[in-house]
């Protein structure tokens, strides 16, 4: 079967299977998700063994540590993925919600009802957890889903998808509500992007190359995001006794994810404190890429750092590397963010209410924080149970995408044999 015929088969199966989900009641959907969790537990060792094959192949091919960490599943990570399903089960089902009800002058009653989008296509790279997260959120909202993971995680994704499909069959539902493209041929990606007869929305979760490909090639609405060039501005009125923990958390906790800190902007009045912070960061293995002014302050304290270029500040590091730039004031910090930010997450540390208000008003990213780490931009942290992606665009969805982002609405009008 050629690529086009294969994709058409997937699309047709997803569309027809999705009708079985669309009006499924919340109890039935939650029972299904409970069965997904049970099937994943039953296949626990099988899934880890499949992931071990992916990790071994990745290391043998010379894949970097950051990418290997992204595709790695261990006991704790897999248990966490399964536990997150219970969180989604506990969430209110948005499907069927009626809102914006109104009675028109002609006697017709109108309202909007929340309904599934239909079929969602998700293209992602080296994160096997996405296979489960996306499938669970799609099923909870009555959507069918076509998944295309990276070739680096093919064995893991096959094992995870098989468990999910067993759960669907066990509940008497079509297995094709969740389908995984098991062929690494990149032509299937561009083909999926043009499957507008069957697929209602595409969500790419990957780097700039994937985002650009989807934006340029898709004939289906695309939710762009997941690229995080995240900033934290240390204001002149920040409490430095508490600031270090936030900065270290933002950079170090999990440096390979999109909400990790990429650039620290430090007010020039706090420059004397930079060497203290730098030592604490370097103890955690962080490499500093610093502007000329901060480089001088670090060198005077005997601390090594690499000189930053303009390109450095436009880089999503996805590693234990941190850009550092000294700014004259809050407005220079805001201007820097406007120029370099991907629109993901930014933060300010300050005890000055006027500065905080100014920053929160002027910085227009998907998530803006006062005295908090950028690491909070996450569906689980926001109370969504899990997330489809973090959208950095402004239409349909913005920020972490939970259940509601996988829905649309239709207008319902009730008349009395009404004519216009």
Swiss-Prot record:
Its main location: cytoplasm. Pfam families: Aldedh. GO terms for biological process: L-proline biosynthetic process. It is an enzyme of class 1 (oxidoreductase). Signal peptide: none annotated. It is found in: Cytoplasm. This is Gamma-glutamyl phosphate reductase. The lineage of its organism: Bacteria, Pseudomonadati, Pseudomonadota, Gammaproteobacteria, Alteromonadales.
């Amino acid at each position: 079967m050629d690529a086009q015929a294969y994709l058409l088969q997937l699309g047709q199966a997803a569309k027809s299977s999705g009708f079985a989900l669309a009006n499924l009641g919340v109890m039935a959907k939650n029972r299904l998700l409970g069965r997904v969790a049970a099937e994943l537990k039953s296949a626990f060792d099988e899934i880890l063994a499949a992931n071990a094959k992916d990790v071994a192949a990745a290391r043998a091919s010379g894949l970097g540590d950051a990418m290997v960490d992204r595709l790695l599943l261990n006991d704790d990570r897999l248990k966490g993925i399964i536990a997150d399903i219970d969180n989604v089960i506990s969430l209110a089902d948005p499907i069927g919600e009626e809102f914006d009800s109104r009675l028109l002058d002609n006697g017709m009653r109108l309202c909007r009802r929340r309904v599934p989008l239909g079929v969602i296509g998700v293209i992602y790279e080296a994160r096997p957890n996405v296979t489960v997260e996306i499938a669970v959120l799609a099923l909870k909202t009555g959507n069918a889903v076509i998944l295309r993971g990276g070739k680096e995680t093919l064995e893991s994704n096959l094992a995870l998808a098989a468990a999910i499909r067993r759960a669907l069959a066990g509940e008497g539902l079509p297995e094709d509500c969740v389908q995984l493209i098991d062929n690494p041929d990149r032509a299937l990606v561009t083909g999926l992007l043009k499957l507008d007869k069957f697929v209602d929305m595409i969500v790419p979760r990957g780097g700039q190359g994937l985002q650009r490909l989807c934006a340029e090639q898709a004939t289906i609405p695309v939710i762009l995001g997941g690229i995080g060039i995240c900033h934290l501005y240390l204001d002149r009125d920040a409490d430095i006794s508490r600031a270090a923990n936030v900065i270290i958390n933002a950079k170090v906790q999990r440096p390979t994810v999109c909400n990790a800190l990429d650039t620290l902007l430090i007010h020039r009045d706090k420059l004397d404190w930079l060497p203290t912070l730098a030592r604490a960061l370097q103890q955690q293995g962080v490499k500093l890429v610093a502007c000329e002014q901060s480089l001088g302050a670090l060198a005077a304290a005997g601390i090594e750092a690499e000189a930053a270029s303009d390109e450095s500040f436009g880089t999503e590091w996805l590693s234990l590397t941190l850009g550092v730039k000294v700014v004259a004031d809050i407005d220079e910090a805001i201007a820097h963010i406007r120029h370099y930010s991907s629109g993901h997450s930014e933060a300010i540390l300050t005890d000055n209410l006027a500065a905080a208000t100014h920053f929160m008003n002027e910085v227009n990213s998907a998530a803006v924080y006062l005295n908090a780490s950028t690491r909070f931009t996450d569906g689980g942290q926001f109370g969504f149970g899990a997330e489809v992606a973090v959208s950095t665009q402004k239409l349909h969805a913005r920020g972490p995408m939970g259940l509601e982002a996988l829905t649309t609405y239709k207008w319902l009008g009730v008349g009395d044999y009404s004519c216009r």
